[in-house]
UniProtKB/Swiss-Prot annotation:
Subunit annotation: Homomultimer. Makes the hexons and eleven out of twelve pentons. Interacts with triplex proteins 1/TRX1 and 2/TRX2; adjacent capsomers are linked together in groups of three by triplexes, heterotrimeric complexes composed of one molecule of TRX1 and two molecules of TRX2. Interacts with scaffold protein; this interaction allows efficient MCP transport to the host nucleus. Interacts with capsid vertex component 2/CVC2. Interacts with the small capsomere-interacting protein/SCP.
GO cellular component: host cell nucleus; T=16 icosahedral viral capsid
InterPro entries reported in the protein's UniProt record: Herpes_MCP, Herpes_MCP_upper_sf
Protein name from the UniProt record: Major capsid protein
Native source species: Human cytomegalovirus (strain AD169) (HHV-5)
A GO MF term: structural molecule activity
Length: 1370
């Protein structure tokens, strides 16, 4: 054993041979010799000395290891034997304030000394190791036997020494690891330290909201500019300049020993820059010309901790007083230290040793470059400089660019055909982390858009009700509406009484919303904004039983979205998109037909006779055939004399003319126009039905009925002459109760019909013809009255009823009609034989005929239905033949019907209300001849022209005169109470607003049909799969995780490290003995500011794939289903999700603990998939909002102007839209996401999610922006972080001398999750067409940051150049 040496038992220490003269390289030999001294002695004595010897051994090796690293330049090491008794050290430093001598006449500053307090931080490190009982037994026993015993003894020695070496190595690494963590705890990010340097003067003032906001903006700007620095660029000058700023931002230490850490050329080392080996390799390769290998004189030992008047330490507090503390104190106070001279000299003298280090020159500073790879290599401890950073990105899908953006900034790089250039964008293209193009469109979003929660307004309504009506005086007018149910009996006759009262009618909130154009809708001045909670439902307050109650109804169709959220030009562009996908073309020469139609229905000379014929025929084929010659003659006369297509005001007459006057009764050129009108109606009908439905059925209804309201039998046309064949689920009310079959009676034309004629004014029963309209006829009739007429008249038509009892008597109760000559022979077809002149002899004068038929009939018929071959009396007698088919007086019927099965999810009890005119007619001019018999019926927003009503009714005339602002055609003219049910109608205020101003062209007709596309999950599925814009946009939110390397700069000697020998304790067991090695380390900051700072220098890899996988809400909210089982299965199949088959126990477990029910793919080549969550967004949201960091909610949640600790004020700042937000000064950019209780708040706010039963295992990138508690917590943290850092921006002269320069609370979040703390998401490169993305890929690196517009398409550039350079910078 005497021949063994420790060099054979322990590896050599990797240090220079001339290093540390007093710490020998034979430390291992000394350890071995010490063990041999006690070999075989008393075990108790051995154990005691073993622990002491091992502690000294560890102390020497770990400090040798530490002092050889460049990190030691940031330390000032001191040995203090009584450190174990020190718990909290408080040190006072004398600082003399620098002064500047001033000129004559100016006051001079006095000499000032400041006492600065520093606290020590205790951070012990510890490591255990075990020795088996067998090893210790062999070591304790004396062997005098065979060689085998000696071998066993040697093996035991080897085992012990291996354990000791491993433990010593752990202590070596642990000291560096502990010191690095200490430096990081007092090293804020560069963007914080630099901002404090720039705003040091602010710290001397009382901080106001403007200054605090400026500080935050500086934080964000510098963070975005320096994040992933080394991935951004390979520009040497830029990197060198940044590293220089990084070093200059730090404060110098007060312990500047000029003899230590100097280069061979005499340059003083200013600090050390530490990072991972990868970052250092990049920097050294970039700045190789600025980095040199220098010999640096480093201290070879640590100093002793002594109390002397010369050093900066004046007091230390202990829990236990040292035995010799009083004597030290006596020496200090006497001023004559009697300490041994050798100890004082040893304390002041430092042994130096030359070390070879990489040194870089940064401005005036010389800095050591160091990486700690050797410390963490092959260990299970993560390098503190390796961290994860979570960044949240957002981008739009389907935004509409208004007409004023009809330009391009892409020059000639991209050429799109007209179809693509002008189409609404429904797709977003992005790049994933591998720079592969990714696409997301509305089809990909079906797993979110089709979930029952989106079509369920109950949570929104609950919040809306709990919040109550607004109490501000300016908003009281929003609460005045009453929706009263009145009996329909005599409703038409009661209309004048409504206007006779001359009382101003409160406007509904829906009407008020239409007053705000797109630019004003999102502003604070929009007082109706609080009701805009959900894109699929209308919310309002109204009066009921003298109480203000909340009302929520489905919007039913896309056209009911407010004009500010879906303006007319958007609907027109959407119609072009539908037409392109349908690939339908209008009939030939349709422009001329529509021109004639428009001229006719807007002509002030439209003949009144047409209205009388319409009422007499009322859609009856027999009646029409009886007077077909009369009708044909009217058409020919009016076309030749006035260029009018008469009878064009009535769908029934137009279709009868097109069908029954094709046998030569009408000239072909005229018949062509009527048939063209029907062809246009059929074209619009086809536009309103998506291609590929193939007469599909769902829940025993055609799929087309789920897509567009025109194909739903529950929607009725405003003017009705026949009942439809399909009346399933529809209730018709003529008086008080819905009609049943017993209350519907058939007309018997041609036989005695005295009872019916006697009941012409009766409300019940309802008399109908035997003929029932087919589904196709019903749809065409709706297209005519809901699309064609409003678009061509701009709502300048009106409903009209005639007093037939009086009118027919006054017209036809004359001898000319009662005593017809025998010579008259009229065929059943209505034609007169050539031998007869219908009793009119040649000698009869025109005057005699006029006298025979009367003045009123003459005015109606003459020049309209007469010609050279048909005198007035004959024409009048032809008209008289239709009297036998006369109907009853006009009635307004109320049609009540539920919605289709897909739309009943949210409000299953909702019953829609429509009011239709029965036995009336549509008029486009006010009758003058028939004025005494006319009754205006303004029952519908399309058919309530106040000009016509005022001309026919003195009460309405006086009403409009007194309230001139009601003289309008955009739906602002108030309807009688019985018809004013805005929130229960199928077509609401936005329809009449559009039709009042739309151009009189076919496209406007089709636009009204496109606005009738339904809002339902089934309709969304069919529209999106046909690549048709659904009427709203999406904001996609995605969080990506980046694995990054930090760069740390620390000034020289910025931290004092106080140490002593490790303490070794043992814990004996039966089979082993465990030794615990503990090293007490105390550190003291030696700066009067921040002496260290960090930055996120390099991204190693992106953990997520940066893809576009949409969050599956069917798995997030697994328990929600649609009420109709067949509809639920159809929607799930279309969206590509399965219906869960869960037992009760599984359900409870999922809702309580969460469950990852998503199946893993068979093979995943993209790594961890990022989840995109979708926020429904108005299409008019400003695209510029997505070009800078902003809150995906549409309203800023970062509120530095409000004390976040005042929860009420903080909540108000988040949700009160009467105050502008902090970022854009608008109330919001997305009311469906920014308000309390809105749709996205319900989806992503945990408070609401718990009510819906969500699966907590799914990560939600949106939750951080919607969870109120999390928002307020983030604001509290940010508020406190800024305040705390600004306190540390003060210098010790004017600031608090007790301030400790450490990272304050929130710094970790500011680095690792800045988006959550600042409540903003970052833009990312996205385009609306693949062509624009390909252009960006070809345009070089700089193209990725540029946002561009190309007519209706756009590019959103990235603000952090991820795709531009970071992920692909070689």
């Amino acid at each position: 054993m005497e021949n063994w040496s420790a060099l054979e038992l322990l590896p050599k220490v990797g240090i220079p041979t001339d290093f540390l003269t007093h710490v020998k390289t034979s430390a291992g030999e000394e350890m071995f010799e010490a063990l041999r001294i006690y070999y075989g002695d008393d075990p108790e004595r051995y154990n005691i000395h073993f622990e002491a010897i091992f502690g000294t051994f560890c102390n020497r090796l770990e400090w040798v290891y530490f002092l050889t690293s460049g990190l030691a330049a940031a330390a000032h090491a001191i040995k203090f034997h009584d450190l174990n008794k020190l718990t909290t050290g408080k040190m006072l430093f004398h600082v003399q304030v620098p002064r500047v001598a001033s000129g004559a006449g100016l006051p001079t500053s006095r000499q000032t000394t400041i006492m600065v307090t520093k606290y020590s931080e205790k951070s012990p490190i510890t490591i255990p190791f075990e020795l088996s009982a067998a090893c210790l037994t062999y070591l304790r026993e004396t062997f005098e036997g065979t060689i085998l015993d000696k071998i066993l003894n040697v093996e035991a020695m080897h085992t012990v020494l291996r354990a000791l070496k491993n433990t010593a190595d752990a202590m070596e690494r642990g000291l560096i690891h502990s010191f690095l963590q200490t430096l990081l705890r007092k090293a804020p990010p560069y963007f914080v330290v630099q901002t404090l340097v720039e705003n040091a003067t602010l710290a001397r003032q009382a901080l106001n909201r403007i200054q605090r906001s400026n500080i935050l903006q500086s934080f964000k700007a510098k963070m975005l500019a320096t994040l992933f620095l080394l991935n951004r660029t390979r520009d040497r000058d830029y990197v060198l300049k940044f590293l220089t700023r990084l070093a200059e931002a730090a404060t110098d230490s007060i312990l500047d020993n000029p003899t230590t850490y100097t280069t061979s050329s005499g340059a003083k080392i200013s600090g050390v820059m530490v990072s991972t080996a990868n970052v250092m390799q990049i920097i050294m390769s970039l700045l190789s010309s600025h980095i040199t290998k220098e010999t640096v004189s480093a201290p070879a030992t640590y100093g002793n901790f002594v109390l002397s008047p010369e050093n900066a330490v004046t007091a230390i507090s202990y829990h236990s007083i040292l035995a010799d503390f009083n004597s030290y104190k006596a020496h200090l106070t006497s001023g004559q230290p009697h300490l041994p001279n050798d100890s004082l000299s040893q304390a002041g003298a430092h042994s130096l040793t030359p070390l070879s280090m990489d040194v870089i020159r940064l401005g005036e500073k010389t800095v050591i470059m160091e990486n700690l790879r050797r410390v963490y290599k092959n260990t299970d401890t993560k390098d503190p400089l390796e961290r994860n950073v979570d960044l949240t990105f957002f981008f739009p899908v389907g935004l509409y660019l208004p007409e004023d953006r009809g330009y391009t900034t892409v020059e000639s790089k991209v050429k799109l055909n007209d179809t693509v250039r002008n189409a609404l964008p429904t797709t977003a293209y992005l790049l994933n982390r591998d720079r592969a193009v990714q696409k997301i469109d509305f089809v990909d979003a079906l797993k979110t858009l089709c979930h029952p929660v989106l079509h369920e307004p109950a949570p929104c309504l609950q919040t809306f009700t709990e919040r109550g009506p607004p109490s501000e005086p300016a908003m009281q007018r929003l609460l005045e509406c009453r929706f009263q149910q009145e009996p329909m009996g005599g409703a038409a006759r009661r209309i004048p009484h409504f206007y006779r009262v001359r009382r101003e009618v409160p406007r509904t909130v829906n009407e008020m919303k239409q007053d705000f154009v797109v630019t004003d809708f999102y502003k604070v001045g929009n007082i109706t904004l609080y009701t805009e909670l959900h894109p699929f439902f209308d919310f309002t307050h109204c009066q009921e039983n003298s109480e203000t109650v909340a009302l929520c109804t489905p919007r039913i169709v896309i056209g009911n979205l407010p004009d500010g959220l879906a303006p007319g030009p958007f609907h027109e562009l959407r119609t072009w998109e539908i037409m392109e996908h349908m690939r339908l073309r209008p009939p030939p020469d349709y422009e001329e037909t529509l021109r004639l139609f428009k001229t006719t229905v807007t002509s002030p000379n439209y003949p009144e006779l047409c209205y009388l014929v319409d009422v007499l025929v009322h859609g009856n084929v027999d009646a029409f055939l009886l007077i077909r010659t009369f009708v044909a003659r009217c058409i020919v006369n009016m076309f030749h004399t006035r260029q009018l297509l008469v009878f064009a005001h009535s769908y029934a007459l137009v279709t009868l003319i097109a069908e029954h006057l094709a046998d030569g009764a009408l000239p072909p050129q005229l018949l062509f126009h009527y048939r063209n009108l029907v062809a246009v109606l059929r074209l619009v009908t086809r536009i309103s039905a998506l291609p590929g439905l193939n007469n599909g059925q769902l829940a025993e209804e055609p799929l087309s009925a789920y897509v567009n309201a025109l194909h739903d039998h529950r929607l009725w046309p405003p003017f009705v002459t026949h009942l439809p064949r399909n009346m399933e689920g529809v209730q018709v009310v003529a008086d008080r109760q819905p009609l049943n079959p017993a209350n519907i009676e058939a007309r018997h034309h041609g036989v005695s019909d005295v009872p019916r004629l006697g009941a012409m004014d009766a409300d019940e029963p309802l008399f109908v013809d035997d003929y029932r309209a087919t589904d196709d006829e019903w749809t065409l009739q709706k297209v005519f009255y809901l699309c064609l007429m409003p678009a061509m008249t701009n709502n300048r038509a009106c409903g009209l009823g005639l007093n037939l009892k009086t009118l027919l008597v006054d017209l036809f109760y004359r001898p000319a009609f009662l005593l017809m000559p025998a010579a008259t022979a009229v065929s059943t077809s209505g034609t007169t034989s050539k031998e007869s002149t219908s009793g009119v002899t040649p000698e009869d004068s025109i005057a005699a005929q006029r006298q025979a038929v009367g003045e009123m009939l003459t005015e109606l018929v003459e020049d309209v239905a007469t010609d050279a071959h048909t005198p007035l009396l004959q024409a009048c007698r032809e008209l008289f033949l239709a009297v036998q088919f006369v109907g009853e007086h006009v009635k307004v019927l109320e049609v009540r019907a539920p919605l289709d099965h897909a739309q009943r999810q949210g409000l299953p009890d909702f019953i829609s209300r429509q009011h239709v005119l029965y036995n009336g007619c549509c008029v486009v001019t006010a009758p003058k001849t028939l004025i005494e018999y006319s009754l205006p019926v303004p029952f519908h927003r399309f058919y309530s022209n106040p000009t016509i009503c005022a001309a026919l009714s003195d009460d309405i005339k006086r009403y409009v005169t007194e309230f001139p602002h009601y003289h309008r055609h955009d739906g602002g003219f108030p309807l009688p109470t019985a018809f004013a049910h805005e929130y229960h109608n199928w077509l609401r205020s936005p329809f009449s607003r559009y039709s009042a101003t739309c151009p009189n062209v076919l496209h406007s007709v089709m636009t009204l049909a496109a606005m009738l596309y339904k809002i339902s999950p089934v309709s969304l599925v069919l529209q999106t799969k046909a690549h048709i814009h659904p009427g709203f946009a999406l904001t996609a939110v995605r969080t990506d995780t980046f694995e990054v390397d930090m760069l740390l700069y620390s000034g020289k000697s910025c931290t004092s490290v106080i140490i002593n020998n490790p303490i070794v304790t043992k814990e004996e067991r039966d089979i082993s003995t465990t030794y615990h090695v503990t090293q007490n380390i105390n550190t003291v900051d030696m700066g009067l500011g921040y002496t260290s700072n960090t930055c996120v220098a390099y991204v190693n890899r992106v953990r997520t794939d940066m893809g576009v996988r949409v969050q599956d809400l069917f798995r997030v909210f697994p328990m929600n289903v649609y009420r109709h089982d067949e509809v639920d299965r159809w929607i799930r199949h279309a969206a590509g999700v399965e219906r869960p088959q869960l037992l009760d126990t599984e359900t409870i477990s999922m809702l309580t603990f969460g469950s990852m029910s998503e199946r893993n793919a068979a093979a995943t080549v993209h790594g961890q998939k990022a989840a995109c969550e979708l926020i429904l967004t108005p299409v008019t949201m400003d695209v510029n909002y997505f070009k800078i960091p902003n809150n995906p909610r549409g309203r800023a949640s970062c509120m530095l102007a409000v004390d976040p600790y005042d929860t009420e004020a903080a909540t108000k700042a988040i949700y009160d839209h009467r105050e502008a937000d902090a970022q854009t000064f608008a109330a919001t950019h997305n009311p469906w996401a920014s308000q309390a209780g809105c749709l996205s708040d319900v989806l992503y706010n945990t408070r609401h999610r718990e009510r819906l039963g969500y699966n907590s295992k799914f990560y939600s990138p949106c939750a951080q922006y919607f969870n109120t508690e999390e928002i307020i917590a983030a604001n509290k943290t940010l508020f406190k972080t800024i305040d705390e850092y600004l306190l540390r921006a003060k210098d010790c002269i004017r600031g608090d001398t007790d301030t400790q320069y450490v990272c304050v609370e929130g710094t970790e979040q500011l680095i690792e999750n800045p988006c959550r703390l600042t409540q903003e998401a970052l833009p990312i490169l996205s385009t609306t067409t693949l062509a624009l993305m390909e252009t960006k890929l070809k345009g070089g690196a700089g193209a990725f940051a540029t946002s561009e517009t190309h007519f209706g398409n756009y590019v959103v550039g990235e603000i952090i150049p991820l795709q531009q350079s970071m992920l692909f910078n070689s």
